[in-house]
A protein has these predicted regions:
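Short pre-active-site segment immediately N-terminal to the catalytic Zn-binding motif
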Residues: 37-60, 72-73
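Catalytic zinc-binding patch centered on the HExxH motif and its immediate surroundings
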Residues: 2-8, 17-40, 46-48
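Short active-site segment of divalent metal-dependent hydrolases/proteases
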Residues: 62, 66-70
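Post-HExxH zinc-binding segment in Zn-dependent metallohydrolases
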Residues: 73-98
Length: 98
């Protein structure tokens, strides 16, 4: 699966941007006011730039997608829930047969 550049949730267009690194050093963010998911291609760990794998980028996309979806539903998804859901979605795509 490839990360989309744009998609709709609740009839709102969400733009996806891949950047080299976020100032926060997070893997990704969702900005509900600007309707943008931003995904970092790298993070800094112990003063070392670590390039994220395709799997990590996809997992981050789904994590932020869950936050975007929940914003339009009830805005109460915790980081742990978003991470769990994104893990399950990635596992579905990685292990499907046929």
């Amino acid at each position: 699966m490839t990360i989309p550049q744009k998609f709709k949730i609740a009839n709102n267009w969400i733009t996806v941007e891949l950047v080299d690194k976020l100032d926060s050093n997070n893997y990704g963010t969702y900005n509900d006011a600007k309707q943008i998911i931003t995904i970092a291609k790298s993070v800094v760990i112990d003063n070392e730039v670590v390039e994220l794998t395709k799997e990590q980028l996809l997992n981050t996309f789904w994590h932020e997608y869950i936050h975007a979806m929940q914003f339009y539903f009830d805005n109460s998804t915790s980081e742990a829930q978003a991470q769990s859901y994104s893990n399950f979605i990635c596992e579905l795509f990685d292990t499907r047969i046929g």
